[in-house]
A protein has these predicted regions:
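Glycine-rich phosphate-binding loop plus the immediately following alpha-helix
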Residues: 1-24, 35, 39-108
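A short glycine/serine-rich beta->alpha loop
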Residues: 6-13, 57-59, 135-139, 209-217
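A glycine-rich, Thr/Ser-enriched phosphate-binding loop motif common to dinucleotide/cofactor-binding enzymes
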Residues: 12-21, 141-151, 221
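A polyampholytic, Gly/Pro-enriched intrinsically disordered region
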Residues: 15-27, 80-83, 224-239
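Catalytic phosphate/nucleotide-handling subdomain of diverse soluble enzymes
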Residues: 49-51, 62, 71, 150-164, ...
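A contiguous, well-structured pocket-lining segment that forms one wall/lid of small-molecule binding clefts
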Residues: 79-81, 85-164, 175-178, 190-205
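Glycine/Thr-rich phosphate-binding loops that ligate phosphate moieties of nucleotide
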Residues: 113-130, 134, 138, 211-213, ...
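Ala/Thr-enriched low-complexity intrinsically disordered regions
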Residues: 165-171
Length: 258
């Protein structure tokens, strides 16, 4: 089975993201509001209000995941990534730089939205390094790491939690009923996880890892496309129009016989 995106695009969608169908399948709950946050090169989320239907999901790219951090590490240390977040953990965040970067148009754009190397690739990293000019190398890595954590928290605060508020039960409105379930390679960065936990705690959000729910952090995409293939085989739609912008549900993928 191949080509899962064209059917959604034919229905007016962007053909992405497709993983929200798995998030809904795994994490929907009648009582808890849950946010599935994947941190790969790009960070993306699926917001699932308590008792939600597929049409009530919100899903979009929050901004850079590991992409900027990895590029900065390669440029400054000739290393592919910041193992365990050790370099970031030894630096200090340039808060003024992060605040300036978060004022960019992308972070203010209302979902659905997608990001890639066009937004956060080499050109962006070059400008980022120039903005951090004069800072120590660990401080620059710490700042790149904070950008990922704070852009996720900002997206939650601005675009996700307001939707959850309307669904929250009055009796539990002051309790921590929102769970952030994190997956992807970013979960291996201890400093990033600590920063993210600190950023979302004031929002009333508890941080969890997908492993706690039976999904290994690095297996999410493989499981997602296995589920999409299963739905295609049974001729059931598996796009999420509220995430992709499609005008209708669609059966995704093509079946090819050898």
């Amino acid at each position: 089975m191949t080509d899962f995106r064209p059917a959604d695009m034919a229905a007016g969608g962007k053909g992405a993201p497709l993983v929200p169908f798995l998030d809904y399948f795994l994490y929907r709950d009648p009582q808890f509001a849950r946010i599935a946050q994947n941190i790969g090169g790009i960070a993306n989320l699926t917001g699932i209000p308590p008792g939600a239907s597929p049409l009530q999901l919100v899903a979009f790219d929050t901004g850079p995941g590991n992409m900027v951090i990895d590029a900065v590490m390669e440029e400054l240390f000739q290393k592919r990534f910041d193992r365990d977040g050790e370099v970031a953990g030894s630096g200090r965040v340039l808060n003024a730089v992060v605040a300036k970067l978060l004022r960019a148009r992308f972070f203010r754009q209302t979902p659905p939205r997608t990001a890639g190397r066009e937004e956060f690739g080499r050109e962006y990293v070059g400008r980022f390094l120039q903005t951090c000019h004069g800072a120590s190398k660990p401080d620059v890595v710490a700042t790149a790491t904070a950008l990922t954590a704070r852009s996720i928290a900002a997206a939650l605060h601005t675009f996700v939690l307001p939707r959850f508020a309307a669904k929250a039960a009055p009796a539990r409105s002051e309790q921590k009923v929102c769970q952030l379930i994190v997956s992807g390679g970013g979960t291996k960065n201890a400093t990033l996880m600590a920063m993210l936990r600190n950023e979302v705690a004031p929002l009333g959000i508890d941080l969890h890892f997908s492993d706690e729910f039976g999904l290994p952090a690095e297996a999410k995409e493989a499981v997602a496309f296995a589920l999409l293939a299963h739905e295609t085989w049974h001729r059931r739609p598996s796009n999420v129009p509220s995430a992709t912008g499609a005008k209708r549900a669609a059966i995704l993928g093509k079946i090819s016989y050898a």
